[in-house]
């Protein structure tokens, strides 16, 4: 699946499709950072973050199956869909995911974090594993 993963290089957004209990997909464009130092080279991990109470977080808790594709800011898909499994990160992994996202988006991420804290919004880091 190297070509499927290569399509994300240089992309700023990925379209995350999570699934309702009915099986209907819900697509959301999100910022992401790829973990290129992952210990298993056959696994690609994308980190993203969201407000803890967001629908996508609730859907991931109910069903970890997701699909991702590179997209633009509006969510227009720019490549092929890839299947994956998502999980809510805790502790050190959440901090690592935040660090990768801050490194990629720098000032925009820092400002977003500031306003999230100001509004008392709790953030959740999500890892998406692609085999």
Model-derived features: positions:
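Short, structured beta-strand-loop surface elements
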Residues: 53-131
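Extreme N-terminal tail/first-helix region
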Residues: 1-15, 111
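Covalent nucleotidyltransferase core used to form phosphodiester bonds in nucleic acids
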Residues: 4-5, 45-50, 54-61
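Short beta-strand segments
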Residues: 11-52, 66-70, 79-82
């Amino acid at each position: 699946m190297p070509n499927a993963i290569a399509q994300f290089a240089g992309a700023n957004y990925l379209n995350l499709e999570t699934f309702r209990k009915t099986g209907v997909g819900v697509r959301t464009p999100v910022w992401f950072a790829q973990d290129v130092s992952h210990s298993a080279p056959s696994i690609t991990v994308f980190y993203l973050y969201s407000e803890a109470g967001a629908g996508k977080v609730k859907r991931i808790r109910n069903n970890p199956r997701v699909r991702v594709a590179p997209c633009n800011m509006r969510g227009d898909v720019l490549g092929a869909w890839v299947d994956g499994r998502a999980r809510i990160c805790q502790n050190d992994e959440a901090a690592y995911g935040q660090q990768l996202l801050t490194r990629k988006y720098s000032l925009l991420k820092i400002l977003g974090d500031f306003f999230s804290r100001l509004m008392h919004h709790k953030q959740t880091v999500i890892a998406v594993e692609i085999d």
